[in-house]
Amino acid sequence: MNTIISSKNNPIVKRAAALKEKKGRREYGAFLAEGEKLTAECLRSSLQAERAYVSENYAGKRAEEIFALLEKRGLGEDKITYLSESAFSFVSEEKTPQGVMLEVKIPVNVPRAPEGDCLILDGI
């Protein structure tokens, strides 16, 4: 049986809620992908998924697909957090949340040195 977090004061819930704000996203270096479609797209991409948040009654159209993608990406039960409906609504920015969201690490864009010939124009 999975533990369901219902307290809005739980550190995990507070962290997820903080990701709604720019300050929280900068502090944790992550953002929330909310909803079935966006969650599935992030799991299929090269983005680094940190944790999944699932509402206690989640049974969306793509639930089976989402859980299969989570498993494929190595996000086991230790990286899936089950929230009560009220805690999930607290974290969600949607009026009618779909019941699943993904915490994704913000990619760091490292500038690459140009390969081959390069022309740099400055002050033109």
Which residues fall in each region the model found?
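Short, charged beta->alpha transition segments
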Residues: 86-91, 99-111
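Structural motif
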Residues: 29-30, 50-52, 78-81, 98-102, ...
